[in-house]
Amino acid sequence: MNAYETDEEKVEAIKGWWKENGISVVGGLALGLAAVFGWRAWVDHQEDMAQQASSAFEQLVATVETGNPEAARTQAALLLEKHGDSAYGALANLMLARVEMDAKQPEAARKALEQAMAKAPDPGLARVAALRLARLLMAQGEMDAAATLIAQQDKGEAFKGDFAALRGDLALAAGRPAEARAAYDQAIALGAANAALLQLKVENLPPAT
């Protein structure tokens, strides 16, 4: 009888505890499950969006290669509308700038490069856009603006040689060959792109005095 009463007391204690705490326990479990499944849904959504952006960018690249600027602009606009803040958005703006330059629309290209710089989620992509924008500014004769942009964006080790090459071009355009030589030499040492072209520029500089 004692054992029965003890078991009965245990059952009653459990019932009482559940009556007081059952709702909060169920609520906590529900919240926990919601958090787990909500996180999974969010991850799945992000992966799906990334796949859509990747496919849209591949289509944009293919269209650009066909030489149809209007179609490229349309596809770029659609991609940017949905994925403008992603890396694919920055890449789309870089492609759009190329389209506009080929179409002899430097102002439109400039706008695309500025957008790529402003919204690129990766500093490396932003610097690629900055390099192209600096070259565009120099081609338009905006040397001071190009110099300011280079000074702002030449941070860290990435693309340091390419920024040095642009500083050499600026110095050469300003009639400072010694400064240009030093910048070109630095660019070559840092592994800038088109090192052979930079070496030709160095060889064609007037001899140091």
Region locations from a protein language model:
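Short solvent-exposed coil/turn linkers within tandem alpha-helical repeat scaffolds
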Residues: 82-89, 103, 117-126, 153-161, ...
